[in-house]
Amino acid sequence: MAEKEHYERTKPHVNIGTIGHVDHGKTTLTAAITTVLAEDGLAQAEDYSQIDAAPEEKERGITINTAHVEYETKNRHYAHMDAPGHADYIKNMITGAAQMDGAILVVAATDGPMPQTREHILLARQVGVQYIVVFLNKVDLVDDPELIDLVEMEVRDLLSEYDYPGDDVPVIRGSALKALEGDPEQQDVIRKLMETVDEYIPTPERDTDKPFLMPVEDVFTITGRGTVASGRIDRGTVKVGDEVEIVGLTDKIEKSTVTGLEMFHKTLDLGEAGDNVGVLLRGIDRDQVERGQVLAAPGSIQTHKNFKGQVYILNKDEGGRHTPFFSDYRPQFYFHTTDVTGKIELPEGTEMVMPGDNVEFTVELIKPVAIEKGTKFTIREGGKTVGAGQVTEILD
């Protein structure tokens, strides 16, 4: 790890991503952004197939995994996540969307808003993505400019429906494919898009002063060095020599010391809230840490099984349930980076919950999870998202 190039923190760092309906051009836009910025010396061009990297997608052209690319504008350093578009893989968006300070919503002018457009806006709202910039894609394929105006109005209305400022959200029109193919006019549109992202999505106020917390996304072993846990730092900071606890999924809390830190395959002196990092842990075996746990400052977070949550239950049109549910319903609760089954107890006087309802209820999980007031989660059943919410009270 030591001999790697050093990651220099010069420009402010922002996490963004592309969201929107399958085949509307999210990955093409991501490729176009890196290609245009590479011409300006601010990025390495990533082609579509590099971003679209998971092997099982190739046959169907559907993005499954979450791709991270990095690039710079004149003002900022960006980590850009290409969120999966296909409903089957919405689970990955849930882990991914939580990593975004802002999002570029891609809507094909040929189609207008589609079911997943709505689902992604809802999820963005629930996982705390505060700012959305709209890219109306494929405008070269629409002959009538009034149709494009109509699509823009539809998108603005949809954003307003989910408490985004639909009237004020910036909307950029262009063709990602034409920009990727080198059309100078469309390349300028991409530059304009990134200027807009620079201006409209504020540099996030990081939670660097709070105690360190990092949900574990992945675990791997470096031969001769030890076990690395990787993920996005939720809050606080971490550096080599810090003591950390591994919390969640079991009652036992493992203690360790950070012996190495890297970001984008470069060593890092200090990891801060918002950074995607790999943390090398002293004396920890591969089987002592797993996805779904958290690394945390000692004593800062505990595991719990019982909590109250405020939850929005998706309606049928959003891809949710078609029927109500009752007390004793046992779906999956997706916390941080993993699913845990939980039993729902509805409040007194509430006999059932209908799709589209907003409700507070009590949950008992089958495994202890590192949670606290404000921790966000989604509720899933049979591979699809049926609700989203956050912890309002810890009960144990």
UniProtKB/Swiss-Prot annotation:
Q: Where is this region: G4?
A: 137-140
EC numbers on record: 3.6.5.3
Q: Which residues bind Mg(2+)?
A: T27
Any one biological process term the GO annotation gives: positive regulation of interleukin-8 production
Which residue spans traverse the membrane? none
Task: Please provide an example of a Pfam family that matches this protein in its UniProt record.
Answer: GTP_EFTU
GO cellular component annotations of the record:
cytoplasm; cytosol; external side of cell wall; Gram-positive-bacterium-type cell wall; plasma membrane
Region G3, annotated ranges: 82-85
- Sites where the protein binds GTP: 20-27, 82-86, 137-140
Q: Which UniProt keywords apply?
A: Cytoplasm, Elongation factor, GTP-binding, Hydrolase, Magnesium, Metal-binding, Nucleotide-binding, Protein biosynthesis
State its role: GTP hydrolase that promotes the GTP-dependent binding of aminoacyl-tRNA to the A-site of ribosomes during protein biosynthesis.
What family name appears in the similarity comment? Belongs to the TRAFAC class translation factor GTPase superfamily. Classic translation factor GTPase family. EF-Tu/EF-1A subfamily.
Q: Which PANTHER family does the annotation name?
A: ELONGATION FACTOR TU, MITOCHONDRIAL (PTHR43721:SF22), ELONGATION FACTOR TU-RELATED (PTHR43721)
Q: Quaternary state and partners of this protein?
A: Monomer.
* NCBIfam families assigned to the protein according to its UniProt record, in alphabetical order: EF-Tu (TIGR00485), PRK00049.1 (NF000766), PRK12735.1 (NF009372), PRK12736.1 (NF009373), small_GTP (TIGR00231)
Q: Could you identify this protein by its name?
A: Elongation factor Tu
Which organism is this protein's natural source? Lactobacillus johnsonii (strain CNCM I-12250 / La1 / NCC 533)
State the gene name recorded for this protein.
Answer: tuf
